Amino acid sequence: VFHQHMGDRRIDADFDTQVFAGFAHRLHENGIEFKDFSPGNVLVVVRENGYEFYLVDLNRMAFREEMSLEKRLKNFERLPPDERLIRIISEEYASLVRKPFDEIYEGIADATRAFRMKFELRRKMKFWKRRKK
């Protein structure tokens, strides 16, 4: 699982993350929006000749003719709120889409922050809703 590899010293986690950014870019270039890039839904297999990525929850995909940059960056919203992880993905993704690093980093960081805020708000609302019963 992707998040398990982030702390695995047997593999180069930075390189693993860069390769993941390339994998996501290839999906986006082909108009594939995987709606749940949460760490548990991305499986990583380390092979002698590189990495293989597999997606879980394939029913959470959308196929589009084209994906705007805004849509692509929002697609990373479920990544863990780990600045180092977001920075590495942003560096690689920026080079692949030929955009400034700051633009990509801010877009992904904003998307992950907004998602976390919505997630926490929903969690709190559920808590208070249960207390009313």
Segments and roles (model prediction):
Residues 32-39:
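Catalytic-loop of the protein kinase fold
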